[in-house]
């Protein structure tokens, strides 16, 4: 069922007026300034309409027992206590203090420990809706979606399926194999990564795409919306993505045909077509960056890469910022000279990765990507300060990080003299801090020397791994598979139609071709 803003004013009042009576245990809470207190909780810890409130929620809302913020956190309505619902820390508090009411900090529902269920109260519901609407307006999304009006078919489906599906920690909904239609493993592994991208999933499952194409049947975004519905329908039989393949062939003709294609090339082509077909989904909202729009693809995948070219004579700096969807990283063993790895002793731990002598890490690749590069005498530029052509250095850094960072390890080398696959093992972490590679951190690095970030509390640049695409075989003959994170620590291997459970060790020991990381903390604009 799609959740959208409720109608305002009289319609909402009429809806609430016919609601059933609420919980009989609310009397102990509804005293003195209870409405003011409840509004404060919704404003600060549930809907969080302002940037300041969202930052406060991200930093403050952790379980007071285990220090975790992901296990369905609830807040006591009688005192300042946050506790996990999943691990029953909030239950223990309620029993010890006899505080029988708590609020779900994700969805705003009120839970009664005496009733052992979420409860309804007309007065509380009015406050919740009012504060939610205020938060939407602060974020500029309050008027984006109309009230959901089910079709006749949807009404019939609701009659035959009145029960809500309960999602448990062992639930595998969203996992579904894909039939290989003839060397289409390159497409299947990318589809698995996209369908398990949290914000993309939320976008499509909330029916937010508004197609403006003359022929919706040719819209790749409409097909992706249908694909998400198929993946999260609960069906376990492998899906046949024939229509998706046809649309990709239609809109990206260089990928047409049954020969093996590059998964990275397919990813970029798919994002490009989705970006072009998302016209209208941003509801006319202007993008902050003129180089990209505000469609869901750009909101999730687009970052800004800063290039600083420094004159070696006057040291004047020319800066440009370009959008990117992925970061392609050179590997040792390629014809491109690789920066010396791992200076110093063995056994270092850098950015959460085991850094052993002779082992290449993702951090090594990023260090090389962001180091200053001397352009040489054959690539002189005209300096605006010197008014003449001078030698210069160029350095790339991250000006703006995307919500989903995709790292492309350049394993396929094509040159005039050779075509080969680079099989160098690259160690990559479950959690990644991109702070050292930001343009704002450039001053902390001198001459390309890596330094640990001094502000360990800077969570804006921290990422978690959620998908890995691998290539087995040679350049001429190979096969793509992917690892997908379903829950916090549950991983599955997707090999076309076959889905099997995988361990974290299986994931981290894999070769790695495309690495997908998701921001741990989000700040909505």
UniProtKB/Swiss-Prot annotation:
Effect noted on mutating residue 479 to A: Impairs its function as a positive modulator of androgen receptor transactivation
PTM characteristics: Phosphorylated in G2/M phase, but not in G1 phase by CDK1. Ubiquitinated and subsequently degraded in a CDC20-dependent manner.
Active site per database record: 185 (nucleophile), 479 (proton acceptor)
Modified residues (N6-acetyllysine): 129
InterPro entries tied to this protein: Papain-like_cys_pep_sf, Peptidase_C19_UCH, Ub_carboxyl-term_hydrolase, USP_CS, USP_dom, Znf_RING/FYVE/PHD, Znf_UBP
Domain USP: 176-520
Binding, Zn(2+) 3: 76, 79, 93, 99
A cellular component term, taken from the record's GO annotations: cytoplasm
Localization: Nucleus; Cytoplasm
Catalysed reactions listed for this entry: Thiol-dependent hydrolysis of ester, thioester, amide, peptide and isopeptide bonds formed by the C-terminal Gly of ubiquitin (a 76-residue protein attached to proteins as an intracellular targeting signal)
Top class in the EC scheme: hydrolase
Residues carrying Phosphoserine: 237
E.C. number(s) listed in UniProt: 3.4.19.12
Residues annotated to bind Zn(2+) 1: 23, 25, 112, 115
Modification sites for Phosphothreonine: 147
Keyword hit for Translocase: no
Subunit structure: Component of some SAGA transcription coactivator-HAT complexes, at least composed of ATXN7, ATXN7L3, ENY2, GCN5L2, SUPT3H, TAF10, TRRAP and USP22. Within the SAGA complex, ATXN7L3, ENY2 and USP22 form a subcomplex required for histone deubiquitination. Interacts directly with ATXN7L3; leading to its recruitment to the SAGA complex. Interacts with ATXN7L3 and weakly with ATXN7L3B. Interacts with MED1.
Family note: Belongs to the peptidase C19 family. UBP8 subfamily.
UniProt protein name: Ubiquitin carboxyl-terminal hydrolase 22
């Amino acid at each position: 069922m799609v959740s959208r803003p409720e109608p305002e004013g009289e319609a909402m009042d009429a809806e609430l007026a016919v609601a059933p009576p609420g919980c009989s245990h609310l009397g102990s809470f509804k005293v003195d300034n209870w409405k003011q207190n409840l509004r404060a909780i919704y404003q600060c810890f549930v809907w969080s309409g302002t940037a300041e409130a969202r930052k406060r929620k991200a930093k403050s809302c952790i379980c007071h027992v285990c220090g975790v913020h992901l296990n369905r956190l609830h807040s006591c309505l009688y005192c300042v206590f946050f506790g996990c619902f999943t691990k029953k820390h909030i239950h223990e508090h309620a029993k010890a203090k006899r505080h029988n009411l708590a609020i779900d900090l994700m969805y705003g529902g009120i839970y009664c420990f005496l009733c052992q269920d979420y409860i309804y109260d007309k007065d509380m519901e009015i406050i919740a809706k009012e504060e939610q609407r205020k938060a939407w307006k602060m974020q500029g999304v309050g008027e984006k979606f109309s009230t959901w009006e089910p079709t006749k078919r949807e009404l019939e489906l609701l009659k035959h399926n009145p029960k809500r599906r309960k999602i448990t920690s062992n639930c595998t909904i969203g996992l579904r194999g894909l039939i290989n239609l003839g060397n289409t493993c390159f497409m299947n592994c990318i589809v698995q990564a996209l369908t398990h991208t949290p914000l993309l999933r939320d976008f499509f499952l909330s029916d937010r795409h508004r197609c403006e194409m003359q022929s919706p049947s040719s819209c790749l975004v409409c097909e992706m919306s249908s694909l998400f519905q198929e993946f999260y329908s609960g069906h376990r039989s492998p899906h046949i993505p024939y229509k998706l393949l046809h649309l990709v062939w239609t809109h990206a003709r260089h990928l047409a045909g049954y020969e093996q294609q590059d998964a990275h090339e397919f990813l970029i082509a798919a994002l490009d077509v989705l970006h072009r077909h998302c016209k209208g989904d941003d509801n006319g909202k202007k993008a902050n960056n003129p180089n990209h729009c505000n469609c869901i693809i750009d909101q999730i995948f687009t970052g800004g890469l800063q290039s600083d070219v420094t004159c070696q004579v006057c040291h004047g700096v020319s800066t440009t910022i370009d959008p990117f969807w992925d970061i392609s990283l050179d590997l040792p063993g390629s014809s491109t000279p690789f920066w010396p790895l791992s200076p110093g002793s063995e056994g270092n731990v850098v950015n959460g990765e085991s850094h052993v002598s002779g082992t290449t890490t993702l951090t090594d690749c990023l260090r090389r990507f962001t180091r200053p590069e001397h352009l040489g005498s054959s690539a002189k530029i005209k300096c605006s300060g010197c008014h003449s052509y001078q030698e210069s250095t160029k350095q790339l850094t991250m000006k703006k990080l995307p919500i989903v960072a995709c790292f492309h390890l350049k394993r396929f080398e094509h040159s005039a003299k050779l075509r080969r696959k680079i099989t160098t093992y690259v160690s990559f972490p479950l959690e990644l801090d991109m702070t050292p590679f930001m343009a704002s951190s450039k001053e902390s690095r001198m001459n390309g020397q890596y330094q640990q970030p001094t502000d360990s509390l800077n969570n804006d640049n921290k990422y978690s791994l959620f998908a890995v695409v691998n290539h087995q075989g040679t350049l001429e003959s190979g096969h793509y598979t992917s690892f997908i994170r379903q829950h916090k620590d549950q991983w599955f291997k997707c090999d076309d139609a076959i889905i099997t459970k995988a361990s974290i060790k299986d994931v981290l020991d894999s070769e790695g071709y495309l690495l997908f990381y998701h921001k741990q903390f989000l700040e909505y604009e």
